[in-house]
């Protein structure tokens, strides 16, 4: 599926990630320690889970959660036929190397595609009923102005949501993935 040009571009990106890591490794060390502490404090306050999509940010948060004590369960809400098939490949690669408590709760395809229902809210409601009303998310302020406002208003954790990488940059995320050889 990937062209030679795609793979060459990916190699160049990985080289930039390694260079960023070389130059900013101490910054990433602090970000990592801080993120694990935020997860631990949030998990200590009551039942929670890591909401995982198997995208790059979710993979980082799942890995950070695996370092936390207590380590909350990781839950994926696959969206049936509309789900990116590569998510399952990333999931399988991650689970083959990391012993975590993991569950899947199938989201109804209708919920994700009918235009009248908010798939994310339906997934959170299902998780609240099945696991816990509180969750750990991989959202980052850099991704949108709405997420930035959420971070400014609530910080890395509110009563129901934890955002341990909320202030990380995309470069931080890719450097973390490179440092820990995490799948994406």
Model-predicted regions and their roles:
Residues 1-184:
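Nucleotide-activated chemistry modules centered on ATP-dependent adenylation/adenylyltransferase
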């Amino acid at each position: 599926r990937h062209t030679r040009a795609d793979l060459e571009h990916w190699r160049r990106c990985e080289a930039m990630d390694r260079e960023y890591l070389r130059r900013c490794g101490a910054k990433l060390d602090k970000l990592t320690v801080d993120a694990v502490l935020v997860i631990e404090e949030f998990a200590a306050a009551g039942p929670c889970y890591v909401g995982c999509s198997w995208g790059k940010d979710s993979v980082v948060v799942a890995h950070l959660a695996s370092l936390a004590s207590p380590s909350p369960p990781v839950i994926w809400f696959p969206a049936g036929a509309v789900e990116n098939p590569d998510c399952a490949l990333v999931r399988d690669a991650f689970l083959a190397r990391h012993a975590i408590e993991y569950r899947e709760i199938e989201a109804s395809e209708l919920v994700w595609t009918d235009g009248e229902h908010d798939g994310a809210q339906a997934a959170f409601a299902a998780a609240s009923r099945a696991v816990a009303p509180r969750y750990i998310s991989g959202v980052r302020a850099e991704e949108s102005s709405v997420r930035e406002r959420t971070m400014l208003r609530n910080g890395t954790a509110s009563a129901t949501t934890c955002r341990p990488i909320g202030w990380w940059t995309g470069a931080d995320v890719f450097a973390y993935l490179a440092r820990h050889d995490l799948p994406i």
